[in-house]
Every structure is written in C-alpha cells, then in structure tokens.
Amino acid sequence: TGGFSFYSILGNAKLVHSVDSSSKAIDLTCKNVELNFPGDNRHQAFAEDAFKFLDTMGDQYDLIILDPPAFAKHKKVLNNALQGYRKLNAKAFEKIRPGGILFTFSCSQVVSKENFRLAVFSAAAQSGRNVRILHQLTQPADHPVNIYHPEGEYLKGLVLYVE
C-alpha cells in the first residue's frame, strides 16, 4: 500500500522514491499516493529490484527505509538471507548522506534479532561509516509472541543514525 511512502510525504519529505520489485505493489502505492495527495509530484515509483536500484541511482538520501520481503522462510537458507540483509544495508549506507537516518527491517521468522543486527553491523563496518542505534523496533502488541515459539517474533527493525 506504500505506507512508508505515504507517511514520508505526509511528513513533508521533498522527494520520495518508492521501490518494489512487484509492479502490482508499485501500482497500488501510486494509487494510494494520488488518492491522498492529488497532483503531488514529490513521489516517484520504480518497479525494480532494490539492489539494482541502489546500484544505479546516483542520488544521496537523508532518510532510507528498507522493508524487504522475508529473505528466509526456512533455516536452510538462513545464511543466504543474512548475506542479503548485509548486502542491502551496505548499499543503503553508500547512498545515505552524513547525518542521515536508516530504518531497516527484517520480517524473516528464522532470522533472529541478534543475527539481523550482526548483518547490519557487518554492513556498517564494510561501509566504513560510523553508525548509532537510535531505536530498536519489533512487532506491535497485537502480534504477541508465544514464549514456546520464539520464531513468532518475526518482525525486527533498527533506526540508525549514519555519520
């Protein structure tokens, strides 16, 4: 639905780029933006792979929100997922201006909070940027986690200040 894009525009962002590999998701985002902000030209949408987009886009950003689909649904692909998170965040660190804010998320059940943090920290170290955690995010209270099923804590996120 483009929720992050919607709220970025609502928060007076000068320019919002929405990127999703799904053209249907991009179409829905564009319809939502047009419905709520008719004629507003601050939004640009790209039906493209985010990795490719970050490689080719020359812009630098003050704020980046990474909210990819689940990179791993089974433990056998956990290492590939962690490499994907590291790579995606490394590309974001390259594109964010000093003093920028990065919101980064994982909704993969099999990726623990600690493994996600380590993948992001590895990306930060690789980028050579000094990064501070401003806030750690998790799923809301309407998605409770059963103590006998810790994998139910599927959503994790970090809000990072990038120097």
Please give the residue ranges for each predicted region.
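S-adenosyl-L-methionine
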Residues: 22-65, 71
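Amphipathic, non-transmembrane alpha-helical secondary structure
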Residues: 6, 55, 86, 90-93
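Class I SAM-dependent methyltransferase "Motif I" SAM/SAH-binding loop
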Residues: 1-3, 107
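C-terminal catalytic and target-recognition region of SAM-dependent MTase-like enzymes
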Residues: 101-163
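Conserved SAM-binding loop of SAM-dependent methyltransferases across substrates and taxa
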Residues: 3-14
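Conserved SAM-binding motif I beta-strand of class I
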Residues: 15-20
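Helix-to-beta-strand junctions that scaffold the AdoMet/dcAdoMet cofactor pocket
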Residues: 96-98
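Mobile active-site "lid"/loop adjacent to the S-adenosyl-L-methionine
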Residues: 61-91
